[in-house]
């Protein structure tokens, strides 16, 4: 899924011009990390350099790469509601829901060359009748949380292991709850395992504020520089 907002960012010439300097700034800040984390910092520097090399190789524009993969049949790129609007909250204003869908479809086609066939509904949230608006925009399939299918009436014969078709002809795939658990669970999944990086700890919280200001960063915030592993806490 490539959301409409992300498409707009990826197509913005100024942001593309600022990306390589942004990567270089992060590499420079990594040089000031605590020496205890030198190995993690060095590994992250290599990753940032690889990202810079790839960005240069595609001419500073990622969209043609995505477009080529889609046209080759390697990817089936889908969209999302234009501003990630939570559609059940907008159901009393069908015009607003339609605007979310049609804007997303048009922007996807304009920037990627093809109309999307599928959509990732924000928060996998569905309400009765939404499928008619989706079909009107040419959207043929989407995905729901497992209970979105398991609590359907009638209950699907194969549960989440086969798509169901709505009255408007839109197919819905269910997300397997058991497969979701390892990804999201802090107690049983990847987020709680010590071999994975701690998402919430960031070099932006650890460097002196004066150094951040020298780099043009006016306030403490995450910089995308994660050097700590997950602990048992």
Positions of PLM-derived features:
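His/Asp/Glu-enriched short active-site or ligand-binding loop at hydrolase and phosphoryl-transfer sites
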Residues: 140-152
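CE4/NodB-like, metal-dependent polysaccharide N-deacetylase domain
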Residues: 94-121, 233
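Aromatic- and acidic-residue-enriched segments that line the glycan-binding/catalytic groove
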Residues: 6-27, 190-194
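Short, solvent-exposed turn/loop segments enriched in Gly/Ser/Thr/Pro and often Arg
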Residues: 1-4, 81-83, 118-127
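Active-site cores of enzymes that catalyze phosphoryl transfer or operate on phosphate-rich substrates
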Residues: 24-91, 153-233
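Generic structural signal for well-ordered alpha-helices
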Residues: 63-67, 98-105, 131
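Hydrophobic, small-residue-rich alpha-helical packing segments that form membrane-like cores
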Residues: 110, 125, 130-140, 155-157, ...
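Short His-Asn-centered micro-motif
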Residues: 120-124, 144-146, 173-175
